Amino acid sequence: MGFPMTRKKWCLIGAAVLGLGVAGIATSINPIAERYVAPMVQEQLHNTVRGTIQYDSMHIAWNGDVVLQNVSLRDENDHLVAAVPTMNVSMKWTSAPSILMGNSSGAAIVSTITLEKPDVHVWQLADGSWNVNSLLESSSKNDKKSFDGNIVINDATGAVRFKDGNVHRLSNLDGNIALNVDGMTKGALNGLLDDHSIAVNGSIDMNKMDDFDLFVRAESVDISGIMNMVPSNKNLSITSGILHDVKAQITGRDGKYSMSGNLAFDGVGGTYKNGSTTYQIGQGNGKIFFQNNTVLITHSGWYVN
């Protein structure tokens, strides 16, 4: 005499079968990943970066992803650029046959690199360029395919240092970057800049890194730290102040910057030179609308000595 199967028993059997199936897939993927993929990922990380990458450990997850712990990235001068507690490298398994047959480079198998809680250090060099400009190696002409995967950033912190000594702190930074080492890289990031919200998206030509387009929305920015990026009259020097509700597009072409957008400002101070006379200005406030070299200031007030 048989007994009817209850829904609960069917669910338990289904879960067991599913678990065995997943375990079977994981069992088949892991030996391949251990033998071929882990060394390939290790090689590509070193080949892609001008500098050094070190990590405490590397292991293969159940799904074949490569997981690295306590990763550090240093530039060619051995300066720390990033420290990442956990880096997860996901694969495009459909690219494996092409790579094994020699039709694609090893970089083609990397789909997504996820950085968990990275701490990033970016600084401006004396010539106005940035330490990260030369960090990535372009692929050689013999490569069948360059790296064009996604980089996902979760809960990053960091610092941006300008050549004049100003430092801005980043925190709670999340984003996604579609990286193409030999072409146009696009991305979007949002988080906190000096404890105020900021969102940035745009693109940069990796073959000519002076060519970029950035769109910025910021709640509040200390003006003293960004003046060396803003086109301004040579007779005007701004040394203090806060920008609010910033909406700006910043474009770089051949090392020259142009900006358009609008913002509000207050507490602005500095100097203005008119001929042989220099004026002290302070407590400036108002709104600005700007387009390249055209600037419109409204609802504005200043103290002038």
Where are these regions (language model features)?
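Short extracytoplasmic
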Residues: N47-N70
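Secondary-structure transition motifs
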Residues: G51, N70-N176, N207, M229-L236, ...
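N-terminal type II signal-anchor transmembrane helix
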Residues: G2-T48
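Beta-propeller and related beta-repeat scaffolds in trafficking/envelope systems
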Residues: V160-D182, N190, M209, K234-L243, ...
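Residues on the solvent-exposed faces and adjacent turns
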Residues: S57, N70, M91-W93, K117, ...
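Transmembrane beta-strands of outer-membrane beta-barrel pores
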Residues: K117, T157, L193-D195, M206, ...
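Short beta-strand segments that buttress and anchor functional surface loops
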Residues: N70-R74, G187-D194, T298-Y303
